[in-house]
Regions:
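N-terminal phosphate-binding caps/lids of nucleotide- and nucleic-acid-binding domains
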Residues: 2-266
Length: 266
């Protein structure tokens, strides 16, 4: 379970798997800040019976076949560690079906062991439920913060993925209440849908293309800067990154426009 530090880590891994599957619609369901249930449902390509079972084996991945593939990775994940890590520390139920198949496969795993696998009737795509996270690692479970803090981490992780993929319809339920319902849109509309309608007037589009890199996105107008960090997102090839170097570069561009102890949004 070393890859999974908290419920938000599992949310990231599962949602990225859905993106890699070519999903156009992803649903995230959370109960008790992810301690009781983390469920992700997508309409992606689904898995074969064998791939579904293999996905829980360590370093088993369908995303690379040869060493050369390592230098041309376009998928979010490729090491094959996360699913195996989750299987070791939670109760897992997976249903997956490929479009051309009449039946899908249904797997139940407990403590890293496959308890059951059978054919099932289910929708195209994949539904995976992570239940009772860290049930067999009490020290790790006790290390988790309050439900409020863990939920905040989950929402932040969800927001990063949603911002990077405006072309995918994504929704999120917290304890049976719909918290986000984001239809397919462009980047600007996705930002507004996540951060609130008032943010639309704050946004300034930027675009730069060079032989080395293409840069596009939005920055916030100086008058809307804040005393606190947050609302700062860098994505490289649709992956969220944290970079002190890049953050300082942006902050330097704002010098003279905002007070030293304030932070711009981007």
């Amino acid at each position: 379970g070393e890859v999974i530090q908290r419920p938000a880590s599992a949310v990231k891994e599962l949602m990225e798997n859905s993106i890699d599957s070519g999903a156009e619609k992803i649903q995230l369901i959370i109960k008790d800040a992810g301690k009781t249930l983390i469920q992700v449902i997508d309409d992606g390509c689904g898995m074969t019976e064998q791939d579904a079972r293999m996905s829980f084996e360590r370093h088993a991945t369908s995303k690379i076949n040869t060493a050369v593939d390592l230098f041309a990775i376009k998928s979010m994940g490729f090491r094959g560690e996360a699913m195996e890590s989750m299987a070791a520390i939670a109760h897992i139920e997976l249903k997956s079906k490929q479009t051309k198949k009449e039946l899908g496969t249904h797997i139940i795993i407990q403590g890293g062991k496959v308890e059951k696998q059978e054919d099932c009737a289910c929708a195209n795509g994949t539904s995976i439920s992570i239940k009772n996270l860290f049930y067999n690692v009490p020290a790790r479970r006790n290390f988790l913060k309050s439900d409020k803090v863990e939920t905040r981490h989950i929402i932040e992780q969800f927001s990063r993925i949603a911002l990077a993929n405006p072309d995918i319809s994504i929704s999120m339920f917290l304890d049976d209440v719909e918290h986000f319902h984001l239809g397919k849109s462009n980047t600007r509309q996705r930002i507004v849908n996540i951060t609130g309608a008032k943010s639309n007037q704050k946004l300034v589009p930027i675009k730069e293309e060079t032989t080395l890199v293409n840069l596009a996105g939005f920055i916030g107008k100086p008058e809307f800067c804040k005393r606190t960090r947050g609302e700062q997102y860098f994505f490289v090839n649709n992956r969220f990154i944290k970079s002190t170097y890049l953050h300082h570069a942006v902050k330097k561009a704002y010098s003279g426009l905002i007070p030293d102890n304030y932070f711009p949004s981007y």
